[in-house]
Structures are given as structure tokens and as C-alpha cells.
């Protein structure tokens, strides 16, 4: 429910109008003056009525009155004479109240009230305008509208000052029979009195008319019924309404809410107001809930039964009165007032804008009017357009306003400014923008500037504010800062050029001759290249180009239309008398009619005025001949700046011109008093002072004083349009003629020859040619703005929508209809509102659906004409795409449903009706031509629809969305409409009053009774969870009820397992693969399935690094992908590795055999030594020594003098060879002996000396000191030791090579295993992706099938939209899932790759470690080796 708001809609009525005053009345169409008319306004300000003695009252709805202004003198001389007889003639204009009224902007009627005194006229005029300024009365409730109609009945009395019963019967005739209405009147005592009107036959009637009455004298005169005004009170009228039109649908609702009782209790009423009538999204503090205290106040207002009031109950009648009261409006009532922040920069607002404001009809051949500017401004428009051209003929030297070269009538520029001045701030105080499309010469531009300054005065903003200079980065001033200011939008010179020319003009009173006649290239923005428009759509229509857009050559829509064959003109400088001299003299002499030189064949305008208030002398024209001679070769119409070059007087010595299809349109013939250069073309010639008025027969103006050329009205139509098939009996264009004119039309761009004074008046609305969004962003000039045709705007919106939105955050843009809309139709403004375009200009004279949308949108915020754009369209740190279909950050999507229940007073005819509900917003939110009720035949009074709700499931941006309610008859004619903003809409059961197609109220407004549900949008799969969170008690209570029911059926609660919510099953089914959120190591450790490490297997390999011996691998299975580590032992068991080891062993055995052969060879080289006795004796003792040594080796080990026996099993000695070493007690020498083979090596000291040793028995001393023995030992020791070292080194090198090959093979095997592991991982992930796609496809098909089978979806469009929304949601979800799967695969691959690198790195470390160990062992053995010998 809405917060309490004091809605006081009643205006203040001054006593002179409330009690009535006497005026004399006349109108434009009458020729007589109605004297002593009693004029009054009712106490509620609904109607203005005048009563004349002996006549029926005339009642005028105040909602149809545009304004009351100071009147002029009457045109009819008889009326003027009578007014002079009744008062002072010099004060007639001041004593006159000129009231204009009408149901639309174009068909405006007027009447005049002449007061007895100037003071009375001034007071009543101000009182009427004060009533009109308030817009609250347009938003009253249905009860107040019934009161309004009751007031109309009581004021609309006949000559007997009673209410005709027929008016009451006619009220209900659209749904009820007359006898039934009459019976209800009689039941309520409203039958009235009967009387027979007297027949009055005027003697002045014609003979046939008198004979008609004579023939009917025998007929019975029909009796009439009338009712006293005092009898028909509002209470009785309400009872009559409820009796004739019982609200059965409200009664059904009441019975449902009351629980079959005759009243609503306080608790039920509170629950209804807080649950049904409240938007759940509202803040509880700003919009408090209803409590008992507010219910008591509510009952006092609407419940008439005192007992019910005391008991806190509400009856059915009281409930109906509440539903139809001001406390139950469809829109928050504070939205009617000024509720928006008006201190933001000007570009942050939508501005109500008009296109070609001067036109009252079609774009071609239409009528121009200055009066329509008043209606447009009074209707709330804040940006109006003025197409300014040089006047021709008698109006030469005066700027006019017309649609140039489109055969439209003209109005004076000065007259339009007066109308703007009088009405600019009559309804709204916020600034008005005048959009000039300037085609005038500099002299007329000077007049335009002077007219603006003189007429507007202080209202004109002639220079920027000091705190808001025209500098880069400076924001525009706010609407509050610009209150009651008029801004001019016109091209402007560059700053330095403007300053120079303006100083010269103010100093000398004129400009240089070159500046006067040449186009000025120093216009800001005109030297930049504009991007070509992409938007004509291939229609071939000439695109109208605004003054700040591209030239015609830059617009492809213009280029494609220029397929008209043009004939090259010839210049005839001979005047009417054939004198070339007079023609040449006209170049040197100023024209008598205003001093203008007309050169119609220039590509750009050279027409300039030399006569104005500040010029001291006339320029010398003799210097222009060379320029003119060149310009004469140009096309006469391509760049002509005249408004109507086609109506100039043809002068040619040749035969009369014949109209040609390929040439320009035929021209009017008129004589003129001045001479100029005459251009002759095929089918068209011009003369000096030919008229420029174009009036089509079908659009004859009603008032002469509203045209710049009224004298052309008759002769031009009758004589000069015959070439197009026009005649007196054919006042309108045929389709073929219109197409012909349209094909030959060529739009002329606005002039760049700007007068510095007019340029200096442009400030915050400086139009420039659009050069691109990046250029505009780089310049950062907020006061620059650009205009786009709807085609061009759609092109930019299609290509660069976010950039367009950002552009509109900083500066303004204006959108106008494309030139192909010759019927003045409109485009959908919502498209450009979505992009933040401020001035979306429409044709106000055409009240189509799109104009209704514009009027309905700007009806709020006090009707100021300014609406603050949503936050995301203003903040520079936010990015917004108007084509987005997903919710915007910070904006909560809404869900809206509308159920049309019934209607009241929809039509005054007994005809079938239906209701259509549409939504306009973002493209994804816009729903049109889908939701309509069934036709209820033969009842235009109170049809009951009771349709199923029209559901708008997901509204992405509620702030931009509006609802449109429209009622049509069975033939498709619109009966009423209403535009309501979604962000201000109230939920619950509401009555919606409808408006006319021009957004005006009716005397008895049609009303729709609807139920509106607004809440936060929740996806279907989460609705159950949201409901449970919103009301957990109800959710648990429902669960408990079901549990008790199952227990009653014998089912134990323990037998029921917990199951997931079916609403989330589909979502869970898609999301079943779990996501891993651990570290990368954990993620990889849980990945993979390993098998054998053999290279020929394609199964998964282990994915762990080479671990230390104490580290134990721990394989874990995740996502059905088991991982085991790669073990080196597994790799060593590979066939290739076993084969390599076998080859290594063979190589080693071969090397050892080779070494053994070498040892055997050395032993064979010393046979003589063994025969020596001493050696033999040594040998014998050595054998004994070996025998003893075996017994005592362990005991004597480590002794300084010891016998060491070792069995060598390594390389360097034969198997089973025993080596014995004998050392002296001092340790200085030793002798080595070896046995067990053919030869025995003996170990000696390093110097080759041996010491005598006692082995078993003492060694003879002489043997030890024997030189021969010593030399033999030394020689044998050296040879043998060298051989042993060489063998050891060869074996070491072989081991190194084998170790390297071994680890190379391990590396190769590991790489293959890693490759297989990676391949298995990819195959697994691909399988998961394939499974995911299959699951997603299955889900999409199942969801689409559910939607197709959903019986709650009524229309195909809704079903398609649901499927599209579902597909988009699924697509987004599927993309996210696939992204997660891809990220998971990427992480797995990255981690596996890292682990593979670690494994290879560890393998390299192990290789180097093994190599270092081998080298260390080899060095250690070398250090521990002793010299050995064979003896």
C-alpha cells in the first residue's frame, strides 16, 4: 500500500468565476454577438458554462481548454460595431478573454468573452489560467469522475433550466435498454416531469420548410421529460449508477475476502491491504504497513454504517467506495508532482521534444501555423523546431518558417517568436530549446538575432553562466539553474572568428563584403568528416538532414534518392522588355523591396539583405559579377537556399515551358515589381518577386493572419497545380502525384554562412557535425550536441550501443524522424530512450501510438517536460548495453502480471470491446500485440472480461518500462488508452482511467478494473526456495500437514527418505560433475587413472614425481579418474630396459675377458723368472703362508706387520687368485705374493724395495737384499699395476656410458608414460565434455518440452519468448559449465605438465647423483689401490 499522501486536487476558483459574471460572447464562425452571457465555473473546476436567456446552456470541459489570453478585435464589422456601442472601443482588446479549446493540437477552436471592465477581464483570465496550470485534476479517482459527470449533467440544462432526462438515459444506453434505465430512474424518484415543447415556425423559413411543418401538424407531438437540478444529487446519481451497473465482479471479490460474510473484519482488511494491495518490494519505513489506527481512519472515510465503523467492519458498499477512491490510485500520487532531482546536468534528462513544430499535417504540402507552437508548448514540450528561410515576394527581407521546397505554407519567424514568448513558461518553468534549422542569409540572420533579443528579452540566455563556462570537461548547468530561460540551438562560428566579426559588426555596423556573401568555412564542427549514415533501409527516400548533421552528400539515403534527371539551366539576363542593360543595372543597384539580391542558381545561398537597422550604407555590388557568372552554371535547385524556388515567375523568349517528369515541379506565375536574374529550366522559370506560398487544396488554412503569404491561397491552387493533376474539385494529392513530388524533392542543408550576432547567442546547445564517439570523448565538450535521423541513430545504436550510451551521459543528442515519413508518422521513441538520448523529437500533430507513449511518459514529474534518466544511464563508471537481456548490476528485475477484470463506460455505443495490454522498455522487455482479452459483444457500458492474468515474467529494467492499456471496439477503433510507468505502478486491485488518443481526459472517462501483481523476478527453479524463505512458517506448516496426512495413511516418517527439491533437479543434473576448489597440487593429485607404465599401453600412466625411498605414493580417485605414481622400478621392469641391462652385462663380461687375456699374456712373458731357485723357494713359502694365513687372517688383521689375504672378485685379478702382502716391521717396505694361478703377483712398496718377511718360517736375509730379486719385483710390479689401472679406467668409462644410456632410456620411457598419461587425461576430459554436452542438450529438450506442454501459456508469442528465455538462460549456464570444465582441464593439464617436468628434472638429478656416486667410488678405489706384481 502507498504511503499517506495528501492529494488535494481541487483548484482555487475566484469568486468572479465561481458565482458567475456577465460577458458578451462571440466566436470566429458566428456573425452575431451573444449579449449578457452568464459565465461561471463550478466549485470543482470541472467545467466552464455560459447561459444565455432563452437558450440551452453550453458547457465546456476545462480539460479541453488550452489557455485564456488577451484577445484582439473581431473581424466581423457588425460584431465590432455592437461592441463599440456597449463600451469604449479603445479597451475592447483588453476587455476580451480569448479562450482556445480543442481535443487535439491541430483542430483548435476559439471563442471570445468581452467583459464590462478591464479589471474583470484580467482577473478572470488569470483565474482560468491558474486552474489550467494544475494537472492534478487529470488524475482523480473514478468516484471523482462520476462526480464530474454529475456536475456536467447539472450544468447542462435546457432553456427551462432543467436537466433533460434523455442525457441521463444516453449515459447508460451503450449497455442497458432505455426502458430499464427509465425504470431505475422511476424507482429512485428521478422520473422527472413531462412537457410538450411548443412548435415555433419562423416566417423567414423557406416555403418547402414551412410546408414540412404544415404536413406534420396532424402528428402527435412527442413529450419530453426533464428533471429539476436540485433533485439529482450526487448520492442519488451514485445509487442510480450502482443500480443500473451493479459491480458483480467487486461483489465476488468481497465475498471471497470476507469468507462468505456480509462484512470485512479489521484483521481481514489489514491482511488484504498489506498482502494484496502492496508491492512486496517497497521499503517498510518509507511505505509503512496498514495497522489498526489507519484502518479506523479508512473506515471513517468510506464506511457509511456507523455501527460497522464502531465495530471495525467494512461493508460491501464501503469496500467499493474504497476501491474507487483517491486512496487506491494505480500510480503513486506523488509522481504527479515534481518528485525528481532537477539539479543534475541538462544532459541527464529526457526532454520532451517536437519535430517540425510548425506543421499541422503532412510533411509535403502541409499547412504551417504559428498557433500550433502555443499548443505544443502548453502540452509540455520543451524543445521545438524552427526551419528558417528567406522570405520571397512581398515578404522579401523577412525570415519565414516553412518546410523548404516541400510545398508547405509559410509563417513569419517574428510571429512564431511572439507565440513562444507568451506560452514558453505558462505550464512549466524549465528551459525551452529552440532548434533552428537555418537557411537564411546573413541579413535575415541579423533580423532573427534582433527579434530573439527584442521579443524574449531576459528570457533569452545570450551568454553562458560564469560558473559554467564553455570549456572542456565542464558539465552543463541544471534545469533548475536554467529556469525560465530560452536556449538557441544554431550553428556557431569558431570562437576567434566570431569575436573578430562581432567586434567589426558592433564597431562599423556591417561586415566585410566577402563575409556577407560567401559561405563561412569557420563554422565549428563543419570541417570534420561525418561518418556515413547506414540507415535508410533501402527505401530510396530522401533523408531530411538537421543543421548539425551530415551534408546531403554524406547521407546515402539522400544519394540513393537523387535519381531525378535534371536539365542544365541556361542563363537569360534579359528582362521583360528585352533590355540587357536593365538586367545588368540590377546588379549594381539595391533592390527596392528590402535590398536583397536573389541569385537562384547558386549552389549555396548568396541572398543577403543590405537594409537593416544598423547598416549605414549599402554595399557595392559591382564586384560580384565574376562570381555570379561562375555560379550561373550551377543547378538551379540543388543548393538553392530559397524556401520556394519552384514558384518564381517564368520569363523566357522561347515557347512556354512544358512540365516534365524529369525536371523540377511546375511553378506559379506571378508578376513582380522588381527585377532580378532569371533562370530558365525545363518546366520552371523564376522571376524577381514571385510568391513563395504553397497551399494544397486539401489543407486550406482557416485563418488568414496565420500565414506569411495569404494572397496566394486561391490563384496558386487554381492555376499552378494543374500540372500535377490538381483541380478545384480535387483538393488533395493522389498517391502517384505524391510519389512524384517526393521523388523530385531535394533537401537543402542548413547554411554555414552564420552571422556573428546570431552565433553569439548559442551557448549550451551548440550543434556540431558528428565525427565519431571517440572524437567526442576526446574533445570532452559537454555543450556540443549532434542530431541524428532515426535511420542514422539506429545504425549507430546497432553498431556501437554502449558508446552511444556513454556519449549521452556527457552531452546531448537529438533524434528526428526520417524524411520518408511524409505522412508525419512517428517512430518508437523507446528505442532511443533506452540509449539515453535526450531529445527524441516526434511529430506532435499525429496522435499515433508512439506519440501517446511520449505524452504518457512526460505526464509525470509535474508535467515539466523533463524526466531524470535512470542512474545507470548517467553514471560514467557504469557500462550499459540497451540490448542486454540479462539483469543489470545494481538493478533488480521485476515480475509483473495484469488481470483485466472489467470496464465501465468504455463507449457511448452498444458495441463489442476488448482490452489490450502492452509493455514498452528494453527490447527484451517490450511485448506488443500479444495480450488482449476476448471481445465482449454488445456492451460498451460495463463489460466483464475476467481474463487470465497477462504475465510479464521478467522485466530487466523496470525504470525504463511502461505499461500501455488500450480499449478497442470490435472494428479495431481505439476508444481509450493510458500509459503508466512500471516503477510507479501500484499493486493490487486498481481502477485505471483512460485517456483519449491525444492524452486528454473525457467528460466521463472510461475505466478499467484490473488486478496488478508486482514482485521481484525469481527464476522458476528457485521459486520454491524463495517462497520458503519468505514465509518459513507457512512452508513448514505445509510440510507438517502433508506429514500428518501420510501418517494417517499409515506411512511412518522414518520410511520417507530425504529427496532433493524437484525444482532444482534439472539444475543439479547438469551440475553433477563436482568442482575442485583446492590447490593445484591437490587438484592434480586427485586426477588420473594409471595402469602399467609400458609404452605400448594407452591407458593412464602414473603422474607423480620420482620420490625418495621413504616416500610412499598414495593414489586417490576423483571424478572417476584414478591416479597412481610413476615408479622407476616399474620403468626398470620394462622390456626395453631389461634388454638394455642384458646388453650392458654382456659388454661388461666381454671387457673383463679382454682384460684377463691381457693379464695372461703378461704372465707368459716371464717364464724364466719362475725357474729361479729363490723364486721357487719364495713360491713354496708363499703356498705355506697362504695356508696359515687362512687360519689367522682375522686375528692379525690391522697389524702393522700382517699378512693380508683377500679374494678378489672384482676386476683386475682372476677368479680365485690370492694376493699376499708381506711388510717389514718398520712399514717401509713390503713384498706381495699371489698364488692360485700360473703366476703369483707380489705387492711391493712404492720404491720397489722389498723387506725380508718371515712367512711360516723365516725368509733368508740375503734373499731380501738380493738386487736381482728386488729389480724383478719392481719391474713386474710396475707393469702389472699399470695394466690394472688401465683396466679399472676402461671399466669405469664403460659404466659411465652405460649409466647415461640407462637414464636416457628411463627418460624416454618416462616421457612416453607421461605422454600416455596426458593423452588419457585429454580423452577423459573430452569424454566428460561430451557427456556434459549430451546432458545439456537433453536438458534443453526436456525444458522446451515442459514449456510446450504448459497449459498456462496462452499465446504462441509467449511460448516462444519463454523458450527463448530458457534457451538464453541455459546457454549462459551451459557456457559457464563448459568454461568451468575447460578451466578444470587446463588446470589438470598445467599441473600434469608441471609434474612431468618435475619428474624429468628429478630423473636428471638422479642421473647426476648416480654418476657422481660412480665417480666417487672410482676415485676412492684409486686412492686405496696398492702396487701389485706377479712373480
From Swiss-Prot:
Please report the stretch or stretches of sequence annotated as the PI-PLC X-box domain.
340-491
Q: According to the UniProt entry, which residue ranges have a biased composition of type Polar residues?
A: 1074-1113
Annotated membrane-spanning segments are none
Which positions bind substrate? 489, 491, 787, 814
- Provide the binding site for Ca(2+): 356, 385, 387, 437
Q: Per the record, what phenotype accompanies loss of this gene's function? A: Mutant worms are similar in size to the wild-type but animals are bloated with eggs due to defective egg laying with decreased body flexion and sluggish locomotion. They have defects in the posterior body contraction step of the defecation motor program and become sluggish in the presence of exogenous betaine. Animals are resistant to aldicarb, a carbamate insecticide. Simultaneous knockout of egl-8 and snf-3 results in uncoordinated, hypercontracted and paralyzed animals.
Q: According to the UniProt entry, which residue ranges have a biased composition of type Basic residues?
A: 1191-1200
State the coiled-coil residue ranges: 1135-1166, 1288-1318, 1368-1402
Compositional bias ranges of the Acidic residues kind: 543-556
Q: Which Pfam families match?
A: C2, EF-hand_like, PH_14, PI-PLC-X, PI-PLC-Y, PLCB1-4-like_EFh
Query: Where is this chain compositionally biased, Low complexity type?
Result: 572-586, 652-661, 668-692, 1204-1216
Enumerate the subcellular locations listed in this protein's record, separating them with semicolons.
Answer: Perikaryon; Cell projection, Axon; Synapse; Cell junction, Adherens junction
- Which Gene Ontology terms of cellular component type are present? adherens junction; axon; perikaryon; plasma membrane; synapse
Q: List the disulfide bonds.
A: none
Q: Which PROSITE patterns match?
A: C2, PIPLC_X_DOMAIN, PIPLC_Y_DOMAIN
In this chain, composition skew of type Basic and acidic residues spans: 1150-1162
The protein in question is named 1-phosphatidylinositol 4,5-bisphosphate phosphodiesterase beta egl-8
**Taxonomic placement:** Eukaryota, Metazoa, Ecdysozoa, Nematoda, Chromadorea
